[in-house]
């Protein structure tokens, strides 16, 4: 490992690679042959499986489960209590982990099912169950998750909300 770990109760498997300036909080398990990119933050009580790749500058918040073999791009945000699953037909011996592309945002309590790709800069709303691929630069939510708007529409709404909140605080 290239940097000292932070927190207590951290368990790492064999051949784990943790990049520079990575912060790992309390009670995190990181499986064998997993790679964590530079600048990533991993919150407490996360379970990261074997053969996982996490890109640079990701924020994985508390109580997140990332199953064996998942691939997470750079600058990905995963909110608390989310799960990335890899077993499409339990108890299968063939794992089909999801892929989360660069810049994606996964809200709290989201479940991403196996064999799914969440596209670049896609946003998944809290509590969603992602059962199929999510196109890049879209916002999806629900159970099952469905595309509800483009990233541009979302950013415009968010910008308006932030501006309105600033006026209220004055």
Please name every model-derived segment.
Residues 88-90, 116, 150-152:
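Conserved catalytic-core motifs of eukaryotic protein kinase domains, centered on the activation segment
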């Amino acid at each position: 490992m290239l940097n000292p770990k932070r927190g207590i109760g951290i368990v790492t498997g064999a051949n784990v690679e943790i990049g520079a300036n990575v912060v790992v909080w309390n009670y995190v398990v990181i499986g064998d042959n997993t790679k964590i990119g530079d600048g990533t933050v991993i919150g407490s009580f996360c379970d990261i499986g074997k053969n996982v790749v996490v890109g640079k500058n990701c924020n994985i918040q508390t109580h997140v489960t990332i199953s064996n073999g998942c691939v997470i791009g750079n600058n990905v945000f995963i909110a608390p209590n989310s799960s990335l699953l890899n077993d499409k037909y339990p108890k299968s011996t063939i794992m089909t982990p999801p892929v989360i592309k660069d810049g994606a945002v996964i809200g709290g309590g989201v479940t991403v099912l196996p064999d799914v790709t969440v596209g670049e800069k896609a946003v998944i709303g809290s509590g969603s169950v992602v059962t199929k691929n999510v196109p890049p630069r879209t916002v999806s939510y629900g159970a099952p998750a469905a595309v509800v708007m483009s990233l541009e529409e979302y950013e415009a709404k968010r910008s308006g909300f932030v501006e309105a909140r600033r006026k209220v605080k004055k």
